[in-house]
Each structure stands twice: as structure tokens, then as C-alpha cells.
């Protein structure tokens, strides 16, 4: 599986990837932090327990100097490929959320994310009306809530 990397905070690096540790289920999203010159820490599962019963892959990550860290991936928990995400808050990963606009009818796959200088989220992904259909690139801008600034 492909590893995605992002710096966040003052000197932290986070790696995220899809990992098939449980041979009975599909891939899950894992991550690990590297602080400064230290080695990567323990692996943690990024997606929540509910997501553990479904396949996830194509992890992407975005970090910000203010400490924000978001991981997004392709997820099949609602019966089709959609973009889901989680963010790091007080050292714990949030419950997973389907990305509004990148879930529902059709196939939403291969997300890519970044945080701009204000901490606003930008997301692009591949959309298909059906599996194997022609592809379209979709984009979503999600401003950070004003109380979070």
C-alpha cells in the first residue's frame, strides 16, 4: 500500500497508509507519528471501529503548522466507494465522517487533500457515475469553522 506523509505542528511528521492486518476483512487505515529526530511511533488505526468491518484504501493526509491533521480515504461502508475522513483532536482520531459532496450516488475514489495557509480544507477526487464508467475530477472547498481559528 502507498504511504502518504504530512508535516503538522512545529516538527511532527505523520504517515498514513492502508493496511491489511486482519485477513478476514479488507484494508484499514493506519498511521504513525514521527517527532523530530525520533523514529516513527506505534501504529494506530485511524478509522473508527465501525469502519473496521468494511474496506478502506487510498489514504491521503494533510497537516498544518497550527497542529491540524486530517486523513481521508476511499471507504465502502455505505455500499459504494465514498470519501471519508477523520481528524486528530487532543491526540485521538475523531469518529469518521463521509465527506459531504463526495459520498452517495456514484463512485467517489482516490481522494487527495491539502490544508491552505488558513487551515481550510481542499479536496479533489475521481468521480464515476458507475464502476468502470468515465472519470471526472471533482473538487470541494471546506473552510475551517471560525471558532477554530
What are these regions (language model features)?
Residues 1-149:
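Extracellular, repeat-based ectodomains that mediate carbohydrate processing or recognition
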Amino acid at each position: 500500500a502507498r504511504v502518504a506523509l504530512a508535516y503538522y505542528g512545529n516538527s511532527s511528521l505523520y504517515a498514513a497508509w492502508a493496511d491489511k492486518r486482519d485477513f478476514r476483512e479488507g484494508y484499514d487505515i493506519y498511521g504513525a507519528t514521527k517527532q523530530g529526530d525520533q523514529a516513527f511511533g506505534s501504529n494506530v488505526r485511524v478509522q473508527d471501529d465501525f469502519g473496521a468491518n468494511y474496506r478502506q484504501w487510498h489514504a491521503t493526509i494533510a497537516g498544518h503548522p497550527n497542529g491540524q491533521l486530517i486523513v481521508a480515504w476511499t471507504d465502502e461502508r455505505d455500499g459504494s466507494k465514498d470519501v471519508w475522513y477523520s481528524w486528530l483532536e487532543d491526540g485521538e482520531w475523531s469518529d469518521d465522517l463521509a465527506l459531504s459532496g463526495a459520498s452517495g450516488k456514484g463512485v467517489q475514489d482516490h481522494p487527495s487533500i491539502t490544508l491552505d495557509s488558513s487551515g481550510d480544507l481542499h479536496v479533489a477526487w475521481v468521480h464515476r457515475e458507475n464502476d468502470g464508467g468515465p472519470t471526472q475530477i471533482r473538487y470541494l472547498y471546506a473552510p475551517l469553522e471560525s471558532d477554530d481559528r
